[in-house]
């Protein structure tokens, strides 16, 4: 893994519109344009949603695991096709086959692995997996669409 295939938080902030508390990718470990991306989300007990999900038994919300994978696909899309034109956005279009295999807890490091499957008429399909300690926490196929802002 070479330095030119990693991204630090400053570079991620330049690519994604998300900000705290909704930025769910801390670092990109490796990627190959048009192929795959591997990133990390460090799960801290200080995340604001742990106050209510669930009191006394904090669990990272499954929908946010999916969102973290979607953000990783966004980074891969940006690195593969370049920045969007003014007035364009990537919209999260669909999710298929989402499966949750284990809980993600405070202190876990979630590794996000996304793979480009295909693109047709501005709609891209990706396969995503979130792992903790090498064990699958969540997997799904996702689609995003490149469109003009509405």
Swiss-Prot record:
Q: Which reaction does it catalyse?
A: a (3R)-hydroxyacyl-[ACP] = a (2E)-enoyl-[ACP] + H2O
A GO molecular-function descriptor: (3R)-hydroxyacyl-[acyl-carrier-protein] dehydratase activity
- Give a GO cellular-component term: membrane
GO terms of biological process kind: fatty acid biosynthetic process; lipid A biosynthetic process
Q: What class of enzyme is it?
A: lyase
Any matching Pfam family = FabA
Q: What is its EC number?
A: 4.2.1.59
Positions annotated as active site in the UniProt record: 53
Family annotation (InterPro entries): FabA_FabZ, FabZ, HotDog_dom_sf
Localization, UniProt:
Cytoplasm
Disulfide linkages recorded for this protein, renumbered to the chain, are none
Alphabetical keyword list: Cytoplasm, Lipid A biosynthesis, Lipid biosynthesis, Lipid metabolism, Lyase
Q: Which HAMAP family is this protein grouped with? A: FabZ
Family stated for the protein in its record: Belongs to the thioester dehydratase family. FabZ subfamily.
The record ties this protein, via PANTHER family, to: 3-HYDROXYACYL-[ACYL-CARRIER-PROTEIN] DEHYDRATASE
**What functional role does this protein have?**
Involved in unsaturated fatty acids biosynthesis. Catalyzes the dehydration of short chain beta-hydroxyacyl-ACPs and long chain saturated and unsaturated beta-hydroxyacyl-ACPs.
- What protein name is recorded for this chain? 3-hydroxyacyl-[acyl-carrier-protein] dehydratase FabZ
